Amino acid sequence: MIIFLFLLAFVPLVYAIPTSKQRRQARMRKRASHDALQVEIRFIPKMTADASEIVNTEGVLREMKIECAAYQLAFSKPLLNVPHVLLLKSPENRLNSMIKMFDGWGVRKEAEFRYLKERAAIFNFLQDLLSNINEDVLAVEFSSQRIGLLWGEKDDSEAVYLELVEVLKKLKTLTEETELIYDSE
């Protein structure tokens, strides 16, 4: 009886102990905050859901989402001409309800498509980037306040982290320079 009570009290504590992966992610996120990045846990639409995932057993539609970490870098000042753009990766090139931007990548709204197409420097950079970026990156997000890369954090190695930080810095600079040109016109 005493052993049972001990186990009853102890077992929930085991779930509170972080795993080695959770500890690595916490260290990486802490480092990101030191590198002026903001990290948020976000949910993005799952574009490759099959019929069994979209509808439950009662026939009610479910919104399929993927949990990921958004590593974001703030712009120097708000860029009012930048709409919210979510460029999503679609594995196996299944761009069901999306507008195709690049091979395996698309947006869900016409305004997002137009924004990226009209800014040739950003479009060309993304085209080169997305063809060889880490496969764990699931989305690229633009807003008037910041630029972000959303990824699954499966490969949380130093090299991948440094690559993502470098991409964010280049994309931030490119977006600010491009919007400066559009503001002056």
Language-model region placement:
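Short secondary-structure junctions
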Residues: 36-41, 85-88
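N-terminal signal-anchor transmembrane alpha helix of single-pass membrane proteins
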Residues: 1-38
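Generic preference for well-ordered secondary structure
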Residues: 9-12, 16, 55, 110, ...
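Short acidic DE-rich linear segments
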Residues: 178-185
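Residue-identity detector for glutamine
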Residues: 22-25, 38, 46, 72, ...
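Short extracytoplasmic
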Residues: 39-56
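Structured extramembrane domains adjacent to transmembrane segments
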Residues: 57-170
